């Protein structure tokens, strides 16, 4: 699975669970040579919450380097959370990790937990493989979908 496939799962999950999801197309160069920057990967609506989602995917348990997360992406997620609050917003940074067989986990940091991610990025503190193995803030991909209601409860 690639990161784009992971984002397809997120979008499909939103659309199939009485919500709305849209994958923002990847950045492209314009005719004038300017590059657009996507604010994050997916947006949508679920259970009266605006959903803003940035995804990263690891094909196996390994360290996650925050160089893969752009400053503007985490800043945009935090800004939306600050403007809307957790009662109307689900701003998510997610790292999917394939643990093999039928064990594909989606580690979730949402809303006020995004400050921890921003701090770790600023301090260049990777999420280590061993740390992933001990985290409990995840949902599993089941039958090609993520249970969005389960994410709201995390």
Regions found by a protein language model. Give the residues of each.
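Charged phosphate-binding loop/patch that engages nucleotide di/tri-phosphates or the phosphate backbone
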Residues: 129-154
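Conserved catalytic cores of phosphodiester-cleaving nucleases, focusing on short active-site segments
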Residues: 42-44, 49-60
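Acidic-basic catalytic patches of nuclease active cores, encompassing PD-(D/E)XK
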Residues: 1-36, 154
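N-terminal interaction modules that seed assembly of large macromolecular complexes
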Residues: 33-45
């Amino acid at each position: 699975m690639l990161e784009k496939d992971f984002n397809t799962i997120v979008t499909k999950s939103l659309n199939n669970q009485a919500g709305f999801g849209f994958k923002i197309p990847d950045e492209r160069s314009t005719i004038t040579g300017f590059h657009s920057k996507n604010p994050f990967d997916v947006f949508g609506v679920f259970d009266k919450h605006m959903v803003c989602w940035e995804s990263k995917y690891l094909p196996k348990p390994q360290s996650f380097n925050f160089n893969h997360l752009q400053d503007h992406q985490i800043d945009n997620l935090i800004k939306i959370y600050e403007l809307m609050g957790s009662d109307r917003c689900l701003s998510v940074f997610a790292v999917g990790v394939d643990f093999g067989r039928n064990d594909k986990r989606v580690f979730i940091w949402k809303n006020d937990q995004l400050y921890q991610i921003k701090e770790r990025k600023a301090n260049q503190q990777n999420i280590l493989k061993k740390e992933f193995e001990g985290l409990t803030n995840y949902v599993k991909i089941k039958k090609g979908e993520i249970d969005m209601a389960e994410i709201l409860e995390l």
